[in-house]
Amino acid sequence: MKRAIAIAASGGELWGALKEDEQVVELRATRGGSASRVGEIWLARIVGLRPELPAALVDIGLARPALLSAEDVAPKSRFKILREGETVVIEIAKDARADKAAGVTMRLSRSLAPPANGKPPQRLDEPAPAVAALIAPWLDPAPDAIAVDDRAIYADLRNWLRARHPALVAGLVAANEALYESSGIADAVEQALASRLALPGGGFLLVEPTALGVAVDVDSGTARSAVAVNLEAARAVARQIRLRNLSGPMIVGFVGMKGKGERARVLATLAKALARHVPDCQVLGWTRLGHVELVRKRKAPSLAESIAAARH
């Protein structure tokens, strides 16, 4: 399978697309300095303990203290002896949201020693260009090619890759055309923001994010058998969860089927597709009302949220 990254500057927005065999499977967007802060390493100070969670509150210079859960303390046994005022080296694992604090971890992706006389909060790693934060999650496994349609962004990314991922420099290309349209980003964005998605064989999905979770309804729309529609829908659901970066609780309402065998076949198809596209998404099974329940831990904003932030 060929993996490639396309980076497009369009209308003041910076877009990144991960493509597998020429199909856009993931999208990310940012504007100016609004890129994700995930991966930043900080010398931080513990400003509070929440044993009921269990977690510690950590000052990294944001308006609200970040959350360091006991599971993210290294070693885990150290959580019991953490004290308010203690300094720790952490890495940002989840961006802050309007209603939630940033999540941090002591399990660093790379080793950095704190300065001898450092005073928290203090960033320890070198600030990366916005484009680096945009595509960092897609660099392992290494992509076969990275195309950029903006010369300044190309130069920033080339310098960053030389310092951090020198093996990827050879695959970096300065595109001579606007990639937002030509690489399929525009079409993928339109699809990812649509509440109704047509299935190739007939029928469609209705995808509705709500305050309680994401609801997905499958409509046959044709005289095709329920099983045929549901099997196609199961694969499409997995692709859409990945493309839209959906998370939290999700309910999928498949077209009604006749027996347990058909339901088992659809569930197995869904599980296989999820394992390929979003392996961190759990299948909880059929509910008593005949829906399939899924859950995926939130690690980053959904694509719709990222686009809204980039356009704010």
Which ranges hold each PLM region?
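Single-stranded RNA-binding surfaces
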Residues: 1-312
